[in-house]
UniProtKB/Swiss-Prot annotation:
Taxonomic lineage from the root: Bacteria, Pseudomonadati, Pseudomonadota, Betaproteobacteria, Burkholderiales
InterPro entries: Ribosomal_uL29, Ribosomal_uL29_CS, Ribosomal_uL29_sf
Annotated GO CC locations: ribonucleoprotein complex; ribosome
Species whose genome carries this gene: Acidovorax ebreus (strain TPSY)
GO molecular function, one term: structural constituent of ribosome
GO biological process annotation, one example: translation
Top-rank taxon, per record: Bacteria
Protein name (Swiss-Prot/TrEMBL): Large ribosomal subunit protein uL29
Length: 65
């Protein structure tokens, strides 16, 4: 789980890279769930919320410009 304070320290390019990596991780987890290989399904929810948190902070930084 990514903390908001850690995300706020990153610049716009860093946030975009973080979002991209989180989306790849989320896709992998969805594929594991579809093939019934995922043991802890709560990680899907946590990853989805991390993506939303990063996108929110990215939008705040872009609006501040």
């Amino acid at each position: 789980m990514t903390k908001s304070a850690e995300l706020r320290q990153k610049d716009v390019a860093g946030l975009e890279a973080e979002i991209k990596s989180l989306q790849k991780a989320h896709f992998g987890l969805r594929m594991q769930k579809a093939t019934q290989q995922l043991g802890n399904t709560a990680t899907l929810k946590a990853t989805r919320r991390d993506i939303a948190r990063a996108k929110t902070i990215l939008a705040e930084k872009q609006a501040a410009k």
